[in-house]
Amino acid sequence: MIHSKPTRNLALDLVRVTEAAALAAGRFMGRGDKNAADKASVDAMRLVLNEVEMDGIIVIGEGEKDEAPMLYNGEHLGTGEPPQVDIAVDPIDGTRPLAHGQYNSLSTVALSPRGTMFNPGPFVYMNKIAVGPEARDVIDIDASVEDNLKAVARAKGMDVNDVTVVILDRPRHEKLISEVRRLGARIRLIPDGDVAGALMTSMPETGIDILMGIGGTPEGVLAACALRCLGGNMQGKIYPRNDVERQKGIELGYDLDKVLKLEDLVSSEDTFFAATGITGGELLHGVSYTGAGATTDSIVMRGLTGTVRRIMAQHRFAKLSRISAINY
């Protein structure tokens, strides 16, 4: 018989955070105003994060304090009570798709024990490779595209031409895309939102087998937290945008040649992750508004137990307005 009581699942607190941000941001779908959408989601996310019983510090936020008035790197959030945690936030992963009324924008947040989350410092981008549980032990970011695709195909009992690779649609990936095509693998190009792309590698129903390419470091850490929960794997390498960023990183002590393994990106298994869809996509449905309120679709997970929940929630604005300062 198990006598110790269950520990608290902070992921269930986090889903209220991402729901609030998604509900606030969803009003701006297709309206062409990224800044207004971002402000609405940041305001809502910060308000609800401050209600969570935790002593949190933002490691992955909206930028440095002089660049971001709220949810900035180093900001303290929560009630100040234990547990002490690192926080990674992306109120809108995919601001451009949201502003243009396109698919695959999400609101995401992750927590892990204090000092366990990788701090990317000045670096905005990293090279990434991510896979699901079946191929978790076979990837190597320093190996060739061909070697990685063949290794993933073998691990999953597939031919290379059955493998589907998700890649951000950017000019910098022209060579990568050409190589994947040469090898005969399938490609899913996404305009933004590689957090969703990384998660889909661990969800067989999406048909995605591997994520490759250069994307944001904040999204990389958030994805790593989720993959810790899902049993997948990820590797990354810092990708300086220019010589100034490279030199600054060296001065701060970063090893630019180091392969960042999943355990380097988030060193604790006791991690929590939540995401709520803003605009619809393959991972989550978007916010759907009615005359009385809205419906949200979220995924929440906990690394310690491996439990993954899907939460479809109905929100009634007339009742919410009595207890919430957020203008939905």
Language model segments and positions:
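Short acidic/glycine-rich loop or secondary-structure boundary segments that cap or lie
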Residues: 174-175, 197-199, 219-223, 282-283
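General beta-strand structural signal in soluble alpha/beta enzymes
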Residues: 58-62, 87-89, 98-100, 119-120, ...
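DPxDG-like acidic metal-binding loop motif
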Residues: 82-93, 97-117
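Solvent-exposed alpha-helices and their adjacent loops that cap or buttress functional pockets
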Residues: 50-51, 76-82, 90, 98-102, ...
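Glycine-rich phosphate/nucleotide-binding loop
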Residues: 227-281
